[in-house]
């Protein structure tokens, strides 16, 4: 830009039409700069700088030096599709450095309470909760969730999907794994640090939500401050998100003519929020870019450095804006005008050019939309819910009216049709044509039950229309209310809500209940996970354990890290929204991280009445045990059989834990021995015996620790036996393999030692002799087999276990176990869970319900207090800008009235002059 006058004139050319929903406004000042989202300078080439200063009349002819050769539309699409993605793995991570240019804030700051607000009530989806491994997988990407289809997040408080579902990405801040890089020409950009799937959530576009007067003032203010890059995004009509000084990493997403991301708006609670999503599968290392798709730079084009085959060579400019619409892609799809010829605003050459003096409404009216399909119905309802432009709402409603297919109409009704149409009525209540369109659609819907009408509360809105001055509106409103009054309410049995934190009565009930829960889950596009394995779960799964970081740790938490140790007596849990709270065994809960150990309540001394009751009970017990007469021979044999059976069933419950473990070990060992016998010719007998004992002890310890044993003497099921045998076989196969490798190595070491010694003693080394291995470890040779170090880690100390050789050799073997090359019972992924279970602390008690939400609001950190003060300052700025705007409008109105009055006075004076033939009216 050459001077401030050019900058001011260019700002005046910025269009603030509602159609520019996805506008991101950037303003360049004195120094010619590349169009980038970075907060730093990057020089243009000399040619680009000169060409960027061309006048408005020359702007249509973009310099060829900056512009690649033109390709046909089909050729450019083929090149873009076949081109391998460019990776930026070689660039350093500049995330920390990029934070120096702006203030990171966790959420948008609103200039007033009504900014960003929507008229939609919190709507409930029809999904059913799908609990797997403690996580609710309902409302996922592949589900048929109507909230997700209409771009609305489910409530954290829970509904049909039981809360905590997968359609809460904005609320949980489940951002993608990205980093900030510094490109050669475009400045800062965003790089994917892991593979991303289509429609993955990258970032919410966060900043200060301001009104239009504040937006205009800031454009001038930033220019005076010398700020090179502005970051404005149009959120709604006369509402903007300004991420210039405050925001998050989403502000660094650059422009591309062949984007891999798109910007979309979602309803989250009572606010409309903007997010960046992936449009295709993205490899790790790719830059994340989207198409700005709007005239933000006046009539003069700015060079585009995306480097794509279909690059038009510039961003903005007269040529591009004549041929492209500023409507977002989602609205274009909802209008049904992205048909066979395509709707590609990034390609300069189009089948049908937009006339220079033609606006978006005229352009859309000239294109015939395609017929409504089920997929289109979802897009139409999603766009209609957020629509504030009357002409767009009319086109969307007309698409619904023109549809006569019953299945499509049912799909429209399913997409919260009554609630969305109620919002449309309230938005355009003063326009009789729009109201009549909505009433005709409501009358067209099939009427089966009264449920949807009653739940949407649309009757109250229709009731007000019965008194309308417009006869058609009043009559149709009365007709609808009369028809709805004849419908009956269908009652449904509410589904039982599954509480993942509720403890089961016992481990067997927990497994069987989980299995039934999974069997009853019905999903149109998901496959239920297999039924959990019954006890004992020795081998469990061979796959390594991983935590689901995408769902739990996707966002950057403002709280301290919770993996640090808590004070004694405190435990953590998460509510349905994913917020972490803390609790004690006594049920005390708090949102604030505790710093002191939980105080144990002092044991209350028994009262006098309690002492007397205990004494009486003790006497009764003694009399019962000693004074009960034995059964005489008179008793019938049948009567004598029942009590011993009951005693037998209850006997094991009175035994100590070690006795129960021994009984359970005897139950497991026959199945373990069955596999051991098949390896008697592969491993020494004594070692096999020791392996069997240690494996049995390990399985017993694990099952008792995890409460998987109900009756230690009960026979095992076929499934349990199969799992145990498979685990023992896998373990012994690895033992045989390692045994053979070590035997071969020991033999080679022995031969080498014999050659070195050149003596008869070395040549005669055999059974029971000791040789030095290459690693300096003493190896016991038994019939040419080195088994001294074959050992397994037992759960507890063992005495009398079978071993080889003398006690000295046993002690040596115990000392060398850690360095033994042989497999142990803790080797391999199959035993990873068992080992982790032993090292874990005792399981915490089940968490109580979370504290009230009001308590969470009271926990205000210093950062939150600072953000609150900044938001209050932003509110004052918006109010001041609005006040000045209103005063300017009022002053202009007075000036117009004064000018009109002066003009009338002048005309009157002229009329009174001599010779005047006409008096002014």
UniProtKB/Swiss-Prot annotation:
Q: What class of enzyme is it?
A: transferase
Domain SET spans what residues? Answer: 176-293
Q: Which residues form a coiled coil?
A: 858-894
Q: Which domain of life is it from?
A: Eukaryota
* Catalytic function, reaction form: L-lysyl(36)-[histone H3] + 3 S-adenosyl-L-methionine = N(6),N(6),N(6)-trimethyl-L-lysyl(36)-[histone H3] + 3 S-adenosyl-L-homocysteine + 3 H(+)
Q: Which GO CC terms are listed, alphabetically? A: chromosome; nucleus
**Gene Ontology biological process terms, A to Z:** methylation; regulation of DNA-templated transcription
Q: Where is the WW domain?
A: 564-596
Q: Residues that bind S-adenosyl-L-methionine, according to the entry?
A: 292
Q: Which UniProt keywords apply?
A: Chromosome, Coiled coil, Methyltransferase, Nucleus, Repressor, S-adenosyl-L-methionine, Transcription, Transcription regulation, Transferase
**InterPro entries referenced in this protein's UniProt entry, alphabetically:** AWS_dom, Post-SET_dom, Set2_fungi, SET2_Histone-Lys_MeTrsfase, SET_dom, SET_dom_sf, SETD2/Set2_SET, SRI
Q: Where is the AWS domain?
A: 120-174
Gene Ontology molecular functions = histone H3K36 trimethyltransferase activity
Q: Where in the cell is it found?
A: Nucleus; Chromosome
Residue stretches of biased makeup (Polar residues): 24-37, 60-69, 521-530, 542-555, 624-636, 817-828
Q: Does the keyword Methyltransferase apply?
A: yes
Using the UniProt annotation, give all residue ranges assigned to the region (Disordered): 1-78, 346-365, 503-565, 624-647, 741-921
Renumbered to this chain, the Pro residues biased-composition regions fall at 842-853
Biased region (Basic and acidic residues) positions are 508-519, 741-758, 865-895
Query: What are its E.C. numbers?
Result: 2.1.1.359
Protein task: Histone methyltransferase that trimethylates histone H3 'Lys-36' forming H3K36me3. Involved in transcription elongation as well as in transcription repression.
What family is this protein classified in?
Answer: Belongs to the class V-like SAM-binding methyltransferase superfamily. Histone-lysine methyltransferase family. SET2 subfamily.
Protein name per its UniProtKB record: Histone-lysine N-methyltransferase, H3 lysine-36 specific
- The gene for this chain is SET2
């Amino acid at each position: 830009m050459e001077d401030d006058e050019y900058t001011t004139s260019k700002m005046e050319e910025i269009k603030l039409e509602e159609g520019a929903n996805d506008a991101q406004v950037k303003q360049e000042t004195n120094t010619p700069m590349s169009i980038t989202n970075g907060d730093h300078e990057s020089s243009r080439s000399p040619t680009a700088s000169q060409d960027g200063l061309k006048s408005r009349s020359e702007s249509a002819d973009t310099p060829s030096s900056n512009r690649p050769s033109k390709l046909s539309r089909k050729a450019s699409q083929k090149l873009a599709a076949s081109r391998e993605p460019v990776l930026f793995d070689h660039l350093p991570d500049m995330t920390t450095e990029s934070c120096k240019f702006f203030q990171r804030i966790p959420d948008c700051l609103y200039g007033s309470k009504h900014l960003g607000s929507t008229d939609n009530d919190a709507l409930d989806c029809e999904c059913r909760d799908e609990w797997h491994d403690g996580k609710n997988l309902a409302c996922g990407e592949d589900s048929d969730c109507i909230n997700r289809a209409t771009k609305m997040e489910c409530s954290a408080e829970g509904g049909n999907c039981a809360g905590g579902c997968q359609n809460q990405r904005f609320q949980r801040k489940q951002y993608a794994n990205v980093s900030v890089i510094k490109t050669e020409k475009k400045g800062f950009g965003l790089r994917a640090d892991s593979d991303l799937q289509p429609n993955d959530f990258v970032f919410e576009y966060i900043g200060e939500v301001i009104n239009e007067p504040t937006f205009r003032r800031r454009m001038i203010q930033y220019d005076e401050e010398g700020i090179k890059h502005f970051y404005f995004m149009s959120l709604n009509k006369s509402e903007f998100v300004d991420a210039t000084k405050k925001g998050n990493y989403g502000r660094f997403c650059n422009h591309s003519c062949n984007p891999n991301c798109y910007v979309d708006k979602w309803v989250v609670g009572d606010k409309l929020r903007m997010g960046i999503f992936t449009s295709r599968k993205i490899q790790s290392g790719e830059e994340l870019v989207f198409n700005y798709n709007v005239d933000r730079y006046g009539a003069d084009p700015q060079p585009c450095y995306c480097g794509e085959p279909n690059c038009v060579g510039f961003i903005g400019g007269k040529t591009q804006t004549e041929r492209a619409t500023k409507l977002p892609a989602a609205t274009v799809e909802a209008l049904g005008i992205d048909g066979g010829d395509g709707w590609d605003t990034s390609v300069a050459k189009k089948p049908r050019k937009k006339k220079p003096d033609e606006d978006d409404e005229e352009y859309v009216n000239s294109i015939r939309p395609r017929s409504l399909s089920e997929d289109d119905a979802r897009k139409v309802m999603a766009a209609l819910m957020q629509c504030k432009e009357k002409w767009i709402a009319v086109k969307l409603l007309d698409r619904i009216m023109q549809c006569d297919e019953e299945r499509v109409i049912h799909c429209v009704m399913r997409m919260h049709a009554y609630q969305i149409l109620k919002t449309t009525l309230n938005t355009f209540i003063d326009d009789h044509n729009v109201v009549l369109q909505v009433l005709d659609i409501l009358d067209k819907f099939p009427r089966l039950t009264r449920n949807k009408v009653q739940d949407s509360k649309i009757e109250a809105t229709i009731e007000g229309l019965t008194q309308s001055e417009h006869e058609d509106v009043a009559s149709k409103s009365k007709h609808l209310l009369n028809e709805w009054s004849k419908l009956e309410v269908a009652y449904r049995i509410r589904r039982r809500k599954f509480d993942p934190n509720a403890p089961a009565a016992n481990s067997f009930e927990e497994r069987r209940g989980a299995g039934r829960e999974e069997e009853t889950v019905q999903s149109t596009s998901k496959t239920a996970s297999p039924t959990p394995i019954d006890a004992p779960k020795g081998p469990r799964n061979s796959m390594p354990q991983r935590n689901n970081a995408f769902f739990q740790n996707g966002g950057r938490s403002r709280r301290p890290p919770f993996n640090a140790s808590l004070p004694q007596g405190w435990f953590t849990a998460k509510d349905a929204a994913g917020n972490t709270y803390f609790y004690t065994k006594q049920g005390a809960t708090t949102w604030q991280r505790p710093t002191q150990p939980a105080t144990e309540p002092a044991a209350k001394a028994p009262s006098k009445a309690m002492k007397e009751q205990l004494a009486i009970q003790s006497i009764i017990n003694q009399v019962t045990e000693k004074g009960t007469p034995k059964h005489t021979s008179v008793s019938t044999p049948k009567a004598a059989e029942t009590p011993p059976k009951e005693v037998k069933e209850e006997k094991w419950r009175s035994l100590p834990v070690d006795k129960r473990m021994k009984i359970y070990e005897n139950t497991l060992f026959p199945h373990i021995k069955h596999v051991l016998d098949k390896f008697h010719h592969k491993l020494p007998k004594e070692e096999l015996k020791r392996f069997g004992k240690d494996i049995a002890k390990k399985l017993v310890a694990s099952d008792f620790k995890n409460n998987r044993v109900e009756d230690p003497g009960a026979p095992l099921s076929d499934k349990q036996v199969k799992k145990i045998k498979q685990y023992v076989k896998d373990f012994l196969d690895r033992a045989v393999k390692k045994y053979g490798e070590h035997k071969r190595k020991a033999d080679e070491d022995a031969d080498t030692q014999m050659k070195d010694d050149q003596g008869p003693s070395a040549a005669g080394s055999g059974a029971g002799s000791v040789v030095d291995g290459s690693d300096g470890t003493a190896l016991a040779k038994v019939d040419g087999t080195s088994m001294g170090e074959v050992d397994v880690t037992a759960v507890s100390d063992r005495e009398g276990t079978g071993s080889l050789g003398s006690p000295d050799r046993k002690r040596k073997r115990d000392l060398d176990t850690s360095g033994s090359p042989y497999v142990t019972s803790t080797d391999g992924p199959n035993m990873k869970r068992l080992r982790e279970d032993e090292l874990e602390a005792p399981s915490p008690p089940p968490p109580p319900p979370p504290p009230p939400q009001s308590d969470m609001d009271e926990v205000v950190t210093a950062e939150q207090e600072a953000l609150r003060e900044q938001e209050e300052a932003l509110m004052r700025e918006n109010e001041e800008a609005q006040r000045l705007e209103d005063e300017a409008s009022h002053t202009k109105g007075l000036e117009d009235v004064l000018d009109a009055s002066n003009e009338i006075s002048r005309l009157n004076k002229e009329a009174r002059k001599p010779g005047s033939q006409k008096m002014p009216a």
